[in-house]
Each structure stands twice: as structure tokens, then as C-alpha cells.
Amino acid sequence: MVATPSISSQTKGVVRQVIGPVLDVEFPAGKLPKILNALRIEAKNPAGQDIALTAEVQQLLGDHRVRAVAMSGTDGLVRGMEAIDTGAPISVPVGEATLGRIFNVLGEPVDEQGPVNTKDTAPIHRAAPKLTDLETKPKVFETGIKVIDLLAPYRQGGKVGLFGGAGVGKTVLIQELINNIAKEHGGVSVFGGVGERTREGNDLYEEFKESGVINADDLTQSKVALCFGQMNEPPGARMRVGLSALTMAEHFRDVNKQDVLLFVDNIFRFVQAGSEVSALLGRMPSAVGYQPTLGTDVGELQERITSTLEGSITSIQAVYVPADDLTDPAPATTFAHLDATTVLARALAAKGIYPAVDPLDSTSTMLQPSVVGDEHYKTARAVQSTLQRYKELQDIIAILGLDELSEEDRLTVDRARKIEKFLSQPFFVAEIFTGMSGKYVKLEDTIAGFNMILSGELDDLPEQAFYLVGNIDEVKAKAEKIKSEK
């Protein structure tokens, strides 16, 4: 809880210049606000309409002036208006009362559900946890999704990049992860919509309500808080909304001692917003026109996303890659912070393999014997090598047909196709579309299942029995059903 100084003790300044989202404010001598303090402007514009604007101090210019970035539109702002130094950074509500609600960058509810029932707030700027407070032992975060747990496992308190185009299942994967952490880990999630389409944010909210992740009748039973600063917002809001969502997640980790899932969609827009205001703040642009503080900006956000001895924040971040150029400074800087990458492939979605996670392109720093154990590591590598061989043989199959392959290669293709099908899985949040009940698969069941396919134990089962099932027992049951129907 951060105490805000009373209005009478707050310093008042005067707006002297407005350039787009950036404004200069003059204060009395010796009364300049601190960097990152929130300034509040409440006045009427020349047309008689009310203006209520919050801006964040970014620079001290000299001559008793500061330069600040507005968190909402500056239309109607004129020189001479009064600005009040709140004496503290932007603060947002935190705690259970945020679950099931939608907020803007300032922590104001925008879902027309009335005020937030909490007095607890926290500033969006704070230092990353100390090294002595960090949980340094790598621990795998079980998601219950076979392809992720086996081939690109997530680290508890780690950061995951989610790469995928439109319509390949990013949103459904995000929803399933939120659902699984709520049910299996008793945890909560925070979703930060950074500079993406407002329609997508609305669709996500409606889907959360349909799937029960947000309980519209009893918000206290909800498992996710949402924080949006979308495409239509000024760059100041898009630059800070990620921090607002992170602050809500930090409270669940540090105060409630919970494991939290933080989704950021899209991390590139956070960088893009910083780039937009950088030139207006008078900074010299750096490589490809990005802000010279790019590394610092990304680092300040990413270093706060971590595991402590109290709990963890595991972050899943959608990463837009401009012009598919992975060497662009924005994605390149982000990559340095990621522990795992989950790549969604349109070719797999077209085959009906859901989740459409590419088993060969997705990577994780956790997939090493010292972390996951020898059995898991060997199984994962054997699965990848079988799929890789199948990929190499596809050209030959397309030209000459399956019959021209050697006996060994035919067996490899048969097992690879079963593996590919077995990597699919019905999701809880997709039950209303598929009519199939969702499956959460334990890691040991996943490893055992793939080992049985690789060893040839299941060579006599039909390929279709492996499609959209949970563990290997369900495969056998489905095979029996297929056999009896013939």
C-alpha cells in the first residue's frame, strides 16, 4: 500500500508546451517532481469539456521544467493549465479484487462493472528482486500439454516466446494454459494486452467468460485479471501497460505467495511505443530508428519476471517479428531474455494437429539431462530425430511413393506419423467447439507414451487411434473401439 500525499501538500505546476503525447510542465523552484512521478491534470478545455489526464515524468529539463509523457490523449490540452505532482509513480489496484476485471494502464476498471473493491495499490515502477531472493534451481513448469512438456518445457519463473501468425491457435493455447494453471496449480493469471487490436481483446474476454476462466456471475471465482492498452491508445499507455499487468502479477507472487502466469501480447508493441516517444523526448535514435535505451527498457520489464523464494511469475509473451527479420533489434533484444520458444506452424494447423506447436522449431534451455533427467531428454531427442527423418523422407515419398522406401524407413515414417498425431491433444477450453472433453496429461505419462511408440510396442495400432487423445491408455481404448466398429 503506497500512501499518496494529500492534495494540499502536492506541488502544482503549469503546462508550458504540448507536442503530441509529450508535455513540458513548469514547477516552482525547488519543487520539481521526481523522475517517474505521476502528474495529474484536471481542467476544462476551451470547448468546456472536462479533461482528466495522467502523465509520467521522464526528464528534468532545467529552468524548473520537466518533460512528461501522457497516458491518454492530449486533445484539448492548452498552455497554462494546472498540473499537480501526485508525489508517487502511477499506482494500480492489486489483490484478489482484480480477478475477473479489465483495467487500463492507470488501473481504472473499463469493464462497466463498477469500482474495484480494494484499497490495496502498488506503484508500477519497482526494482527487480535481489539476487539473494531468487530461486536459482531450475524447475520445470508442467503445463499438461504433451508437446510443450516433452519437447520445449517451460521453466517455472521463466520467460517463453510464443511465435505464430493469425489463426493458428495462439489465443486457444493461452486460454488452455490459464485454465490448466488454475486447476492443477491453484494459480492465477494476469493478461497484459499491449498495443494489439481492441477487437481481439474483446473476443478474448468473451471467450474467457464462455470457458469459465472468468466467472461473470461471481467474479471472486475468476482466475485471471486483464490489463489493456490497445492499438488506439497513445504510446505512453502502450509503453506502460505491460508494467501495470506485471505489478498485479507481482502482488500475487510476493504477498499471496502464489505461482502466477503472466501473458503479454505483444511484447514488440511495448518496444514500438518506447520508440515512438523517444524522439519526442529529444533522444538521438539508435539502430533502425529504435530508442537508444532499448536494452534498458526491455531489461527493466524482463528482470522483474522471475522466480523468488516466495513464488514465481512465469511469462508467456507473444513476439511479433517485423518483416520476419529475427535480427531486427526489437526481437533480437527480447530473445536474449527468453528461456523457451514455442513456434506455432500453419502447416500443422492445416493438417488438423492441435495445438499446432512445431516440434522441431520450438526450443527450450530446460531440455538438458541435468534438469529434466536422462529418460526425458533421450525420449525428446528420439522423438525429434524420428520427426526430422520423416521430414527428410517426405520429398522421396511425394515423388516415388511409400513403397519405394526401405523397410527401416517405412517403419520410421509409420512411427513418425503416430508421434505427430499423438502430439495433438483435446483442450478443456475448446470443449464447446469440439465436443470432446479436454485432457491434462502428466509428464510421466507423456514420456511413457512416446517411449512405447518409439520402442515399437504400438506398431500394430491404427494411426487414427493416436489423434486427439490424452495418455496412451486412451490410445489403446480408441484402437479397440475402431477395431470393434470395423
Curated annotation (Swiss-Prot):
Catalysed reactions, semicolon-separated: ATP + H2O + 4 H(+)(in) = ADP + phosphate + 5 H(+)(out)
Gene Ontology cellular-component annotations: plasma membrane-derived thylakoid membrane; proton-transporting ATP synthase complex
Signal peptide bounds: none
Membrane topology listed for this record: Peripheral membrane protein
Keywords: ATP synthesis, ATP-binding, CF(1), Hydrogen ion transport, Ion transport, Membrane, Nucleotide-binding, Thylakoid, Translocase, Transport
Xref: Pfam families: ATP-synt_ab, ATP-synt_ab_N, ATP-synt_VA_C
NCBIfam families associated with the record: atpD
Reported function: Produces ATP from ADP in the presence of a proton gradient across the membrane. The catalytic sites are hosted primarily by the beta subunits.
PANTHER family for this protein: ATP SYNTHASE, ATP SYNTHASE SUBUNIT BETA, MITOCHONDRIAL
HAMAP family, A to Z: ATP_synth_beta_bact
Name this protein carries in UniProt: ATP synthase subunit beta
Organism encoding this protein: Prochlorococcus marinus (strain AS9601)
